[in-house]
Regions:
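Histidine-dependent nucleotide/RNA phosphoesterase domain, centered on the 2H-phosphoesterase fold
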Residues: 1-116
Length: 116
């Protein structure tokens, strides 16, 4: 798979009982969806247990976020400039707690090129 571009879209929240996760999402992207589908299938084939939640491509901006009651996500999204991001490699990352802190450990990284 060749490198491709994705564009940021809106600000969102994943509601959690211990505090919300604030994120910025990406516009629909056929190459990103294809990459997700391939990776999901391969991981399942290799015995990984995966969430069945809907796929929401995003970058986490903050955890345990509490927005001011004066702010709403729609107006906040309009204030954030849109960014075009080149996807040229992917990393499979394990999230786990170490000494009570959420830690991200890269398991594998692959560069995207025509031979993938």
């Amino acid at each position: 798979m060749e490198p491709f571009y994705i564009e940021t879209n809106n600000i969102g929240l994943f509601k959690r009982r211990w505090g919300d996760i604030c994120w910025i999402g990406f516009k629909e992207s056929a190459p990103l969806q294809e990459l997700y589908n391939k990776l999901f299938h391969k991981l399942r084939q290799n015995g990984f247990s995966l969430d069945n939640r809907p796929y929401t491509p995003h970058v986490t901006l903050g955890r345990k976020v509490v927005l001011s009651k004066k702010r709403d996500l729609k107006s906040l999204s309009l204030e954030i400039p849109k960014l075009l991001v080149k996807v040229s490699k992917i990393s499979l990352i394990k999230s786990h707690h170490v000494d009570g802190k959420l830690t991200y450990t890269p398991i594998m990284t692959r560069t995207l090129d025509k031979s993938n």
